[in-house]
C-alpha cells in the first residue's frame, strides 16, 4: 500500500513568517516590520481571491500596497527562494521517506518557488501541486 503525506510548504516546512518578516524589516525598517506583516496577512487573501494572479504577482502587488519603493516591490519574490526550512524539517522528511512515505506539497505559490524550496529542504518530493498552475488558491475546493 502506498502511503502519502501532503504538506503545505510555507509556514509548515519553510519558515515563511521569519523569511517575510526579515525582508519587510530590510525594506521598511525593523520598527515597522510587524505592522507590515499584519497588513500583508490582510492583503494576501484579497489578492488571491480570483485565482488568476501568480504568487509572484501577489507578493509584488502586496509590497506595492504596503508602500514599498519601486525598487523593492519585488523584494519578497526575490528573497523567497532563500527562506530557510525549519531546523527539524529536513531530517523528519527524510525519516518519512525512509519509512516508505511518498511526499507531496500543496502550495499557494508558483512552481519556481517550490522548486527552490525543495532544493533547500534537500529531500525529494514525488509531487508538488501549485496554485497558479491549477488556477486556485487554498482553501478553495478546486485546489483539492
Language-model-derived ranges and their functions:
Residues 2-91, 99, 110:
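N-terminal helical cap/lid subdomain that shapes the substrate entry/recognition surface
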Residues 106, 110-144:
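Substrate-recognition "cap/lid" segment bordering the active-site pocket of phosphatases
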Residues 97, 103-105:
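A structural feature recognizing the 12-helix transmembrane core of secondary solute carriers
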Residues 43, 99-100, 124, 131:
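Structured helix-beta-strand junction loops
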Residues 80-81, 102-103, 132:
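A generic structural signal for short
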